[in-house]
Amino acid sequence: MSAVIRVDSLNKTFARKQALFNLKLEIQAGEMVALIGASGSGKSTLLRHVAGLARCDRDNGGSIDVLGRRLQASGRLSGEVRRLRADIGYIFQQFNLVNRLSVLDNVLLGFLGRMPRWRGSLGLFSAEQKRQALEALARVGLADFAGQRASTLSGGQQQRVAIARALTQKAEVILADEPIASLDPESARKVMDILADINRHDGKTVVVTLHQVDYALRYCPRAVALKGGRILFDGSSEHLSEGFLNELYGAEGDTPLLFSDRARRGAESQPELTLARA
């Protein structure tokens, strides 16, 4: 099986400070993968590169392929980047909605990558596209809010609108950057339930950066742990031990771990970690 996402020898430097070191990663179709690590570990930087929103180093920067096509290499984005972005749904931590537009209009924006630019700029969406957008809103439990301005919604509701937009985009790969970081536990659970449902029932590949490890244990069969721009672990989430996680997060202490008794027992019953080699 060919990888849906292939990262090969990725390096990234910001103002002479290297942020990513020779990262190698393959993700198969239909996987749900958590990228975990402390703040500044490189997980969001990695995700932005996979989305084509950031460029790797020009010298020895490595390459990234998505859906079997070259996205970028050695600091240059592929000529196919616009078409590839149409297949990549990106969910931002801060929702990235247009507050002055209605909820429905925000979801319709997901179609822009697959329609002529002149039609998109004029907002000429078809009746079928509007039907699909309403269907996507119903799936995330927000059909009744279609006519409201996006700015009137809570943070959790706005994040669900962003997911509905990715559904209308018909993306094969969904990348979610800290989608629950600013949400209360109930809103976070709803967002993760929806992402898991899309992965399970639609077969979409989902990669999500998470600070809260208990959500990675609960929702993502595979975890990739980063520290200082290097991959330290890549494997089953069940194999993450509390000792390793305490070392991974260091001075941040217990805050991101949030182990439930069940999660803690599951992690502690697993064999010792085998660290990935960067």
UniProtKB/Swiss-Prot annotation:
For the protein in the UniProt heading, the enzyme class is: translocase
Could you confirm whether the keyword Nucleotide-binding appears in this record?
Answer: yes
Among the GO molecular function terms of this UniProt record, one is: ATP hydrolysis activity
Which reactions are catalysed by this chain? phosphonate(out) + ATP + H2O = phosphonate(in) + ADP + phosphate + H(+)
Give the membrane topology, semicolon-separated if more than one: Peripheral membrane protein
SUPFAM superfamilies (UniProt xref): P-loop containing nucleoside triphosphate hydrolases
The record's function comment reads: Part of the ABC transporter complex PhnCDE involved in phosphonates import. Responsible for energy coupling to the transport system.
User: What family does the database annotate?
Assistant: Belongs to the ABC transporter superfamily. Phosphonates importer (TC 3.A.1.9.1) family.
What is the designated name of this protein? Answer: Phosphonates import ATP-binding protein PhnC 1
